[in-house]
Amino acid sequence: SRGLGDVYKRQVVKRMGAFPENFVVAVKDEQIVGFINGGTTDKPVLPDEFYHDITLHRKDGEIQTVFGLNVIPEYRHQGIAGELVEYFKELAKERGKKALILTCKEHMIPFYESHGMKKLGVADSCHGGATWYDMQIWF
């Protein structure tokens, strides 16, 4: 049977095809141990449909989004996720983007705040029945 992991893998492959320039991996011990990715838009917050409809990605959009940040369990708590966020922020700045935006669950807010992002409040997202928060940083 197909698990949530299979659905997620298909989404990641779609994203890699739609915006390969916005897909960054972390490599350690000669293996991929994490990644960060996201499309670009002109919207200041991230609507749910952006996750599911890759055609909403605008390569020339002024705002960089984060769709996914993941580090495999055995490499977590080693600073890899933070390095990916910082690298992605710098990449967005270098490309002339005006901001970086994302949605996250409550327990991740302190992590993103430690990387300069501001919490805007509860997001409109209802993905997975969870409560999500809009986060952003303007450059």
Regions found by a protein language model. Give the residues of each.
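Conserved G/P- and acidic residue-centered "switch" motifs that form tight phosphate/ATP-binding loops
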Residues: 79
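Short, small-residue-biased leader/transition segments that mark boundaries at the very start
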Residues: 3-8
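Conserved acetyl-CoA-binding loop of GNAT-fold acetyltransferases
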Residues: 113-123
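Short loop/turn motifs at secondary-structure junctions and domain boundaries
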Residues: 14-20
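Conserved GNAT acetyl-CoA-binding A-motif
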Residues: 85, 91-105
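C-terminal "cap" of GNAT-fold acetyltransferases
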Residues: 105-106, 121-139
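Conserved acyl-donor/pantetheine-binding loop and adjacent beta-alpha core of acyl/acetyltransferases
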Residues: 35-70, 76, 86, 126-132
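Conserved beta-hairpin
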Residues: 22-36
